[in-house]
């Protein structure tokens, strides 16, 4: 096997790959796409008629799933586009540690999943309002659950809820 051939797992999925190819014409509203190397959620799709050069074009409007920035792209409907693998997981917040030396750094979270596995490699979300709400609920003694979205090698907390609301 040559160096540039990928390692494939059962079912043909490439091990360690952050994206997979999909025909632009097969994209759906609410699905995902990579635009400029960023994972995005498709919010609008439109297909133009087949032109004199033979391909219908798909116009895509999407939001970056981590920043919320609006992004646009176009591709011939028969060409492949990159689609990110997106995983969502819910964790219980065990502890929030502030950086005492540098308060400008985001607080660090200790989390636990449903199987009891702990995770200590996530910071508070960059969205100050969301981070403040999580800290406020945790400091009030409530059981806080955070929703972590993972895509393109990035893990980020995008929302939270109280365990009682489950």
Swiss-Prot record:
One of its GO terms (cellular component) is cytoplasm. One of its GO terms (biological process) is positive regulation of translational elongation. It is found in: Cytoplasm. Residues 99-125 are annotated as: Disordered. Belongs to the eIF-5A family. Disruption phenotype: RNAi-mediated knockdown at the bloodstream life cycle stage causes a growth arrest followed by death. Cells become abnormally round, the number of cells with 1N1K and 2N2K genetic content is decreased whereas the number of cells with more than 2N2K genetic content is increased. RNAi-mediated knockdown at the insect procyclic life cycle stage causes a growth arrest without cell death. Cells become abnormally round and about 40 percent have lost their flagella. It comes from Trypanosoma brucei brucei (strain 927/4 GUTat10.1). Pfam families: eIF-5a, IF5A-like_N. Lys-52 undergoes hypusination, a unique post-translational modification that consists in the addition of a butylamino group from spermidine to lysine side chain, leading to the formation of the unusual amino acid hypusine. eIF-5As are the only known proteins to undergo this modification, which is essential for their function. Hypusination is mediated by the consecutive action of deoxyhypusine synthase DHSc and deoxyhypusine hydroxylase DOHH. One of its GO terms (molecular function) is ribosome binding. SUPFAM superfamilies: Nucleic acid-binding proteins (SSF50249), Translation proteins SH3-like domain (SSF50104). It comes from the Eukaryota. The gene is eIF5A. Translation factor that promotes translation elongation and termination, particularly upon ribosome stalling at specific amino acid sequence contexts. Binds between the exit (E) and peptidyl (P) site of the ribosome and promotes rescue of stalled ribosome: specifically required for efficient translation of polyproline-containing peptides as well as other motifs that stall the ribosome. Acts as a ribosome quality control (RQC) cofactor by joining the RQC complex to facilitate peptidyl transfer during CAT tailing step. Keywords: Cytoplasm, Elongation factor, Hypusine, Protein biosynthesis, RNA-binding. CDD domains: S1_eIF5A. InterPro entries: IF5A-like, IF5A-like_N, NA-bd_OB-fold, Rib_uL2_dom2, Trans_elong_IF5A_hypusine_site, Transl_elong_IF5A_C, Translation_prot_SH3-like_sf. This is Eukaryotic translation initiation factor 5A. The modification Hypusine is found at residue 52.
């Amino acid at each position: 096997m040559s160096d540039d051939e990928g390692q494939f797992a059962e079912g043909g999925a490439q091990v360690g790959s952050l994206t997979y190819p999909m025909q632009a014409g097969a994209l759906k509203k609410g699905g995902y796409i990579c635009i400029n190397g960023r994972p995005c959620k498709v919010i609008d799709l439109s297909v133009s008629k087949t032109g004199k050069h033979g391909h219908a074009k798909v116009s895509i409007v999407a939001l970056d799933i981590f920043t919320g920035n609006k992004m646009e792209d176009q591709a011939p409907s028969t060409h492949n586009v990159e689609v990110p693998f997106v995983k969502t997981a819910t964790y219980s917040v065990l502890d929030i540690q502030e950086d005492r030396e540098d308060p400008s750094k985001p607080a660090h979270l200790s989390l636990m999943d449903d199987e009891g596995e702990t995770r200590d490699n996530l910071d508070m979300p960059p969205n100050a309002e969301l981070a403040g709400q999580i800290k406020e609920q945790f400091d009030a003694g409530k059981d806080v659950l955070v929703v972590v979205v993972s895509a393109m090698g990035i893990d980020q907390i995008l929302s939270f809820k109280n365990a009682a609301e489950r």
